[in-house]
Swiss-Prot record:
This is Alpha-1-antitrypsin 1-6. One of its GO terms (cellular component) is extracellular space. PANTHER family: ALPHA-1-ANTITRYPSIN 1-6, SERINE PROTEASE INHIBITOR, SERPIN. It comes from Mus musculus. Residues 1-25 form the signal peptide. Murine alpha-1-antitrypsin is represented by a cluster of up to 6 individual Serpina1-related genes. The precise complement of Serpina1-related genes present varies according to the strain of the animal. Induction: Expression decreases following castration. Administration of testosterone restores expression levels. Keywords: Glycoprotein, Protease inhibitor, Secreted, Serine protease inhibitor, Signal. The reactive center loop (RCL) extends out from the body of the protein and directs binding to the target protease. The protease cleaves the serpin at the reactive site within the RCL, establishing a covalent linkage between the carboxyl group of the serpin reactive site and the serine hydroxyl of the protease. The resulting inactive serpin-protease complex is highly stable. Variability within the reactive center loop (RCL) sequences of Serpina1-related genes may determine target protease specificity. Belongs to the serpin family. GO terms for molecular function: serine-type endopeptidase inhibitor activity. Glycans are attached at residues 50, 89, 101, 164.
Length: 411
């Protein structure tokens, strides 16, 4: 009599396990590296959160009343990556400006933690509709950059591509074509211009196409008014959704906060809706500890929600962001003497793109009876029909994925 799990099946299973062990990548082995402490790496994630909010405040002061959107993990990772190619003084300057010295971790451990945090994000891509990537393009004639190349590939989940920067126009085309291909045409013409003496280009992106679900299947989409401010109103698709959400009041921010967990992906999405006329105050008062306190106070409740469909996209040259953070010199021939800095004496380009869309899950709208039935119960009500702030982080390691201000949800 043959058992349900035969000896042939057992041998096949053993063979597959051996094959998996043999074909483990370096990245998988690094993920199991006992020297990587997830608890310590959460300190790095926390630091990224704090630094990104500081950066957001400075961007808000300079941007007027428009949208702001960037990916903290992608922006800070790109800047931290540059320290791999720097001598001790410059590397220290970059990491201290990013406040990583306050984690108490050695430089090597900080870079390992970036690998760990980025790896955790990449693992969610198949189930979360999240797409992210990083590529470094370096001039083909450069030498003495082995440490930089090795670190970029192994620690920052980045492709390393050697190209000829002599013809900057052709180099720009090659970079844009490569990124368009690896992003499956989701990212087009990410680099707008290159200086003629460019030797290095760092390009990264993050895309999240989120879908809003409902515990009860109560959802529909209607075109309604959205108030931009200053007496201006536009028509936008508004998702009407009844579901269990987190809705609470933050008094010292003069704001109502909605946290959604019913979006695709293991992410926490915070919408901070300032009271009328309080946006500027909220932006300058916001700190990351606010979010930590919010999470401790979360209580779920039935919410009658109207939220605009979002279609947001912004591209940032990181040189200006580094300046806002206080990183005043990178690869400057007058201040560095390492092999990398002796070689890299020209211009460099660092670009980060963030794309965020949120729409309704499924194409079949709910019937009015669904809303009427649930509408008879005690519930919170929230209309996101005016500008708000948005902050998105993963639940596993608290990595900040997106941070921004939404004035026009269809920009």
């Amino acid at each position: 009599m043959t058992t349900p799990f035969s000896s042939h099946g057992l041998l096949l299973l053993v063979g597959l396990c051996c094959l998996l062990l043999i074909t483990k990548t370096k990245h998988e082995k690094l993920y199991e590296d006992p020297s990587i402490d997830p608890f310590q790496c959460r300190k790095v994630a926390l630091t990224i959160c704090n630094v990104s909010i500081t950066l957001f405040k400075k961007m808000a002061q300079l941007s007027g009343n428009g949208n702001i959107l960037f990916s903290p993990i992608r922006v800070i990772a790109a800047i931290s990556m540059l320290s791999l190619g720097s001598n001790g003084n410059l590397s220290k300057h970059i990491l201290e400006t990013l406040r990583f010295n306050k984690t108490g971790l050695p430089e090597a451990e900080i870079h390992k933690c970036f690998w760990y945090l980025l790896h955790s994000i990449h693992q969610t891509e198949e189930t979360s509709s999240l797409q992210t990537g990083s590529s470094v393009f370096i001039h083909q004639d450069l030498t003495s950059v082995d440490k930089f190349v090795k670190g970029v590939k192994e620690l920052y989940h980045s492709d390393m591509i050697s190209i000829n920067f002599t013809d900057s126009s052709q180099a720009k085309t090659q970079i844009n074509n490569y990124v368009m291909e690896i992003s499956q045409k989701a990212i087009v013409n990410i680099v707008k211009n290159l200086e003629s003496d460019t030797f290095l280009a760092v390009v990264n992106y993050i895309i999240w196409n989120a879908k809003l679900d409902s515990n009860f299947g109560c959802r529909s989409v209607k075109v309604k008014d959205y108030h931009l401010g200053y007496g201006m109103t536009i028509k936008v698709p508004m998702i009407h959704n009844m579901a269990m959400h987190y809705l609470f009041r933050v008094g010292d921010l003069s704001s109502t906060v909605l946290m959604l967990t019913l979006l695709t992906g293991n992410f926490a999405t915070y919408f901070i809706i300032p009271d009328p006329g309080k946006m500027q105050k909220v932006e300058q008062s916001l700190t990351y500890p606010h979010f930590r306190r919010m999470r401790r106070q979360l209580l779920t409740r039935l919410v009658d929600l109207e939220i605009p469909e979002l279609s947001l996209s912004e591209t940032h040259d990181l040189e200006s962001m580094m300046s806002l953070l206080g990183i005043t010199y990178v690869f400057n021939s007058g201040t560095n003497s390492s092999d990398m800095n002796d070689t890299l004496q020209k211009s460099f380009k660092v670009v980060s793109k963030a794309v965020l869309t949120i729409d309704e899950k499924g194409s079949k709208p709910s019937t009015n009876s669904c809303f009427k039935k649930l509408g008879s119960t005690d519930m919170g009500r929230m209309q996101l029909n005016r500008p708000f702030l948005i902050f998105i982080q993963d639940h596993t390691n608290d990595v900040p994925l997106f941070l921004g201000r939404v004035v026009n949800p269809q920009n």
